[in-house]
UniProtKB/Swiss-Prot annotation:
Keywords: Acetylation, Motor protein, Muscle protein, Myosin, Repeat. One of its GO terms (biological process) is actomyosin structure organization. SMART domains: EFh. Residues 7-42, 84-119, 119-151 form the EF-hand domain. Regulatory light chain of myosin. Does not bind calcium. The keyword Phosphoprotein does not apply. InterPro entries: CALM/Myosin/TropC-like (IPR050230), EF-hand-dom_pair (IPR011992), EF_hand_dom (IPR002048). Myosin is a hexamer of 2 heavy chains and 4 light chains. One of its GO terms (molecular function) is structural constituent of muscle. It comes from Gallus gallus. This is Myosin light polypeptide 6. The keyword GTP-binding does not apply. GO terms for cellular component: actomyosin; cytosol; muscle myosin complex; myosin II complex; myosin II filament. The modification N-acetylcysteine is found at C2.
Length: 151
């Protein structure tokens, strides 16, 4: 069925179960990408939607999937090697480093994360940057990327 070891499959199942809020062995479609990201993958929202069969937005919080359905989706995402690395993300943020000192304004990074590319909600951004701003409102983007990639 898949190329994962028994140990990996057990780890995936454990993470899957942490997202199973009702204990019925299922997660919502809307949680699929979160489980994958918790397991070290970095799929775009578009990639997650594709492996889910491109459901309508109102189905995301209604439809569910079992672990047996999730595993082949995880395999598809894991095979995608174009997920970016530390240097890619740092380079992307360096564009906003006007002073060339390894920091970006917190307000600017918030704006970028809610408006460009894989848009995040304001709540997600606040959760992400919490505790990373210095007294001048700047964020060390290398530290931020390191924290995000470490899970």
């Amino acid at each position: 069925m898949c190329d994962f070891s028994e140990e990996q499959t057990a780890e995936f199942k454990e993470a899957f179960q942490l997202f199973d809020r009702t204990g019925d062995g299922k997660i919502l479609y809307s949680q699929c990408g979160d489980v994958m990201r918790a397991l070290g993958q970095n799929p775009t929202n578009a990639e997650v939607m594709k492996v889910l069969g491109n459901p309508k937005s109102d189905e995301m919080n209604l439809k569910t999937l079992k672990f047996e359905q999730f595993l082949p989706m995880m395999q598809t995402i894991a095979k995608n090697k174009d997920q970016g690395c530390f240097e890619d993300y740092v380079e992307g943020l360096r564009v906003f480093d006007k002073e060339g000192n390894g920091t970006v304004m917190g307000a600017e990074i918030r704006h970028v994360l809610v408006t460009l590319g894989e848009k995040m909600t304001e709540e997600e951004v606040e959760q992400l940057v919490a505790g990373h701003e210095d007294s001048n409102g700047c964020i060390n983007y290398e530290e931020l990327v390191r924290m995000v990639l470490s899970g």
